[in-house]
Structures are given as C-alpha cells and as structure tokens.
Design a protein with these regions (language model features):
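Cytochrome P450 core scaffold surrounding the K-helix E-X-X-R motif
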Residues: 42-48
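Extreme N-terminal starter segment of soluble prokaryotic enzymes
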Residues: 1-2
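NAD(P)H dinucleotide-binding glycine-rich loop of Rossmann-like/cofactor-binding domains
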Residues: 57, 66, 92-122
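Extracytoplasmic/periplasmic beta-strand context in beta-sandwich domains
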Residues: 18, 87, 103-104
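Short N-terminal binding/cap micro-motifs at the start of the first secondary-structure element
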Residues: 10-17, 41-42, 80
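Glycine-rich beta-strand-centered segment in the early N-terminal region that forms part
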Residues: 21-38, 51-95
Length: 122
C-alpha cells in the first residue's frame, strides 16, 4: 500500500511516498479506502517531530493524517456498527506509528468513523 510519510523529521520536503503492508480491520474496527485527507495542524507536528515523545516507538516511516474521508471497504468481524461496505464515510484518525490518513487505506475504531452526509463526496 502506498502512503505519504516521513522517514526523518523535517519540513514539508521530508514527506515522501512510502510502501507499507496493507492494513486490515480487526474486531471493533473499520477500514476506509481513503479518498481525501485534510492537513490538520497536528499532522505538521508529527511531520516535524514535535510530537515524537508522544508517538508510538515504532520505527519510521511515520504517516501523518488525523482526518480522512473515503469509502468503507472492510469491517472487522464482530464489529458493532451501522456502517456497511461501500458507505461514504469520514473518520478521525489517531496518527500513531504508520496509521495516519495519508495512505490508500486506514483502519480506525468503529467509534471514530461516521457515515458522510448525503450529497457529500470525498
């Protein structure tokens, strides 16, 4: 899976295309096929290293992205949600490790994703 991440902290020029394993939804989780990701001020702090002490200690790359919009394409077994595969949805993503929204797919807790309002597209 392609994502935009950083292998070393810095300015916008530190962002690069990275390859990551495709994530899958587990129990209590929903996976989105990301169509849009906002640039949240927190994403800048992840990119420049200001949040390094608060991030998981996984090795880089770090993938920013707190806000995502797209389509639900996988729901973890036993997940309690009103969402269905194919629904347009929006999510708040906690950017720990490589789980930010600047990626082709993102997995989030079901409680962090909602159906997009009618007429809204990513």
């Amino acid at each position: 899976m392609r994502a935009i991440g950083v292998n070393s902290y810095g300015g916008p020029d530190a962002l690069e295309v990275v390859e990551l394993p495709e994530p899958h939804a587990g129990r209590g989780e929903v996976r989105l096929r990301v169509r849009a990701a906002a640039v949240n001020p927190t994403d800048t702090l992840v990119r420049n290293g200001a949040r390094a002490e608060h991030q998981r200690k996984d090795p880089p790359p770090y993938v920013p992205g707190m806000d995502a919009a797209g389509e639900v394409d996988e729901i973890g077994e036993g997940t309690d949600t009103e969402l269905h595969v194919g629904d347009a949805a929006m999510a708040i993503v906690v950017p720990d490790g490589s789980h930010g929204a600047y990626a082709e797919h993102v997995v989030v807790p079901a409680a962090s994703v909602v159906r997009a309002p009618a007429g809204v597209s990513a």
